[in-house]
Amino acid sequence: MAAGSGVVPPPLGAGLCTVKVEEDSPGNQESSGSGDWQNPETSRKQFRQLRYQEVAGPEEALSRLWELCRRWLRPELLSKEQIMELLVLEQFLTILPQELQAYVRDHSPESGEEAAALARTLQRALDRASPQGFMTFKDVAESLTWEEWEQLAAARKGFCEESTKDAGSTVVPGLETRTVNTDVILKQEILKEAEPQAWLQEVSQGMVPALTKCGDPSEDWEEKLPKAAVLLQLQGSEEQGRTAIPLLIGVSREERDSKNNESENSGSSVLGQHIQTAEGLGTNSQCGDDHKQGFHVKCHSVKPHSSVDSAVGLLETQRQFQEDKPYKCDSCEKGFRQRSDLFKHQRIHTGEKPYQCQECGKRFSQSAALVKHQRTHTGEKPYACPECGECFRQSSHLSRHQRTHASEKYYKCEECGEIVHVSSLFRHQRLHRGERPYKCGDCEKSFRQRSDLFKHQRTHTGEKPYACVVCGRRFSQSATLIKHQRTHTGEKPYKCFQCGERFRQSTHLVRHQRIHQNSVS
């Protein structure tokens, strides 16, 4: 295609970072040939968003696309399967429904399997969400652990006020044209005119109405209830428009006692016995039981449990009104929910690699990457396929392998009897037929696989895209670079099991083993 248009794609190394081939190499800022390492995600966005009007002409547009695509997919570093993984992940995120897409992208999945798991988790939560304009205690309480209640109880009335300030009052789907107002929802919990006994009967049945008749809305209830905790949940279908419904779930003990003294025999004192503090243990005057974090529901059979999936939608809605990612990176403005995640991310910019392998001296920016690397020395393969028993060093390799069982298609070679997968059958049969369909245009040499032809062509072009970050020496093959790097690190991964001597290259080990064979003979 490029030849027909008169545009020759830039060499593989042009405009790219030259990096040491290892699992976390994007963190090597200093290895950039141009001195400014660019995040692959940034290059992906630039690749997708490039407009013809931004460049001088068709040749420059094509050249720019080549450059951005290679910075994004990094063919000098990633394998074909890893590149396919990136492409499939991007397309998967693109075709997701809008409500799922935003949630999954926010979690920055690194693989298709991780993205699918996130989408499935949120889909379950959305499927189980009530489509009506009511929220039950069972829907909220049963789905959360005590630890999650603890997190939600930290919310403040301000969240609800901010969420409804711009829209004013919000129509609740399924409740005719009645409206929801923050003060109205809060006041219904303690107002004397609200017929508390009837209200508590509805609470005991597990149903909290979204709107109750209320008194004067001009009173400053925020001062009276400074520690009121509010839950928010999306209600209604996407077509009708979703609505955030606030629900009071905690009132401070001091405010409750104060209100009880003022009301004496009013229904608010009864209600105060059932909605207690979100900051500690509270004793209910009717049953005398201590309830963790002070949450007491009249129906004692309603207890939180550990089903997190059905609460994901609720938690995500709450996060939308919070500062979701308070820890910001000064270099790229990326946000994180936890400080530890920010520290890990910053190593990409600083190039810091605090984790070192004791066997070969190789360093890593993440402890998880070191653990994976160490398995190359120990031979450990902790991930076993339940179908065939084959073991793998990494979970992603197991996931990739398990796809082959989804459509089991294995064939027996008639020539040698070897069992091969359908994807490898034609390649295997070329061994017997002596077929070499890929021919070099310079020297007429033929190859069985296209990748072998590409590697060979570098001997003619002189292209050496793989550079050693220690001494600057360049190589045409990544495998040759890896072997060379062992001269700097001192790594000797190949061990003779007879005498224990170690070697940098497998060929050296084979040559050494002949010594033992000759001595035996």
UniProtKB/Swiss-Prot annotation:
Task: State whether keyword Zinc applies.
Answer: yes
Q: Where is the composition biased (Polar residues)?
A: 26-41
Q: Where can the Glycyl lysine isopeptide (Lys-Gly) (interchain with G-Cter in SUMO2) cross-link be found?
A: 20, 259, 412
Q: Which CDD domains match?
A: KRAB_A-box (cd07765), SCAN (cd07936)
Spans annotated as Disordered: 1-45
InterPro entries hit by this protein = KRAB (IPR001909), KRAB_dom_sf (IPR036051), SCAN_dom (IPR003309), SCAN_sf (IPR038269), Znf_C2H2_sf (IPR036236), Znf_C2H2_type (IPR013087)
Q: Which residues form the signal peptide?
A: none
Biological-process GO terms, alphabetical:
regulation of DNA-templated transcription
Tell me, in one coarse class, where this protein mainly resides: nucleus
ZnF bounds (C2H2-type): 327-349, 355-377, 383-405, 411-432, 438-460, 466-488, 494-516
Tissues expressing the protein: Expressed at high level in testis.
- Supply the Gene3D superfamilies for this chain: Classic Zinc Finger (3.30.160.60), DNA breaking-rejoining enzymes (1.10.4020.10)
A molecular function GO annotation: zinc ion binding
Which keywords fit this entry according to its UniProt record? DNA-binding, Isopeptide bond, Metal-binding, Nucleus, Repeat, Transcription, Transcription regulation, Ubl conjugation, Zinc, Zinc-finger
Q: Which residues form the SCAN box domain?
A: 38-133
Q: Where in the cell is it found?
A: Nucleus
The record ties this protein, via SMART domains, to: KRAB, SCAN, ZnF_C2H2
Task: Write down the Pfam families for this protein, in alphabetical order.
Answer: KRAB, SCAN, zf-C2H2
A GO CC annotation given for this chain: nucleus
Q: Where is the KRAB domain?
A: 135-196
Q: Which family does it belong to?
A: Belongs to the krueppel C2H2-type zinc-finger protein family.
Summarizing the function annotation, the protein's role is: May be involved in transcriptional regulation.
Protein's name according to its UniProt entry: Zinc finger protein 394
Organism for this UniProt entry = Mus musculus
